Amino acid sequence: MEQGKGLAVLILAIILLQGTLAQSIKGNHLVKVYDYQEDGSVLLTCDAEAKNITWFKDGKMIGFLTEDKKKWNLGSNAKDPRGMYQCKGSQNKSKPLQVYYRMCQNCIELNAATISGFLFAEIVSIFVLAVGVYFIAGQDGVRQSRASDKQTLLPNDQLYQPLKDREDDQYSHLQGNQLRRN
């Protein structure tokens, strides 16, 4: 069993090292994303050393900027900007940067206060429901009259009337002359 654990650790270490090596290979990452703007807009910045910068989205040219304006505004992050963006200077073209925003408009941030609020509301609602069921079920809906306590009860032999013997009825005898066939 120890050999299996050792093999699993070795495989995991190899996979993690491959990911680290793949990330450390530096490419031509000239495009950077800045999405912490006060107005909620998403900006792309090109670090190319050129006077004129051309922006591409999904392989198609979308804009042309001068050197002093290296930032491309994608608009509000609530509009879910997405696509493969590249910038090109006079000498080189950046690697593509995939931008994909998925903003949740009606989401709730789950933190300790929110979860405790949900739990408190759930406990209170269960308590209110239990108290309501207790009071509704505890009420006597039909009250018996006191006259039933004063009735004279019949003796056991008078409760039931004996059956009369009849020869003409189908079920008048328990045993029949004919056997039932399937």
UniProtKB/Swiss-Prot annotation:
**Effect ascribed to mutating residue 163 to A:** Abolishes lysosomal targeting
Keyword field: Adaptive immunity, Cell membrane, Disulfide bond, Glycoprotein, Immunity, Immunoglobulin domain, Membrane, Phosphoprotein, Receptor, Signal, Transmembrane, Transmembrane helix
| Residues annotated as domain Ig-like | 37-94
> Is RNA-binding among this UniProt entry's keywords?
no
Q: How does it assemble?
A: The TCR-CD3 complex is composed of a CD3D/CD3E and a CD3G/CD3E heterodimers that preferentially associate with TCRalpha and TCRbeta, respectively, to form TCRalpha/CD3E/CD3G and TCRbeta/CD3G/CD3E trimers. In turn, the hexamer interacts with CD3Z homodimer to form the TCR-CD3 complex. Alternatively, TCRalpha and TCRbeta can be replaced by TCRgamma and TCRdelta.
Domain text: A di-leucine motif and a tyrosine-based motif are individually sufficient to induce both endocytosis and delivery to lysosomes.
Q: What protein does this entry describe? A: T-cell surface glycoprotein CD3 gamma chain
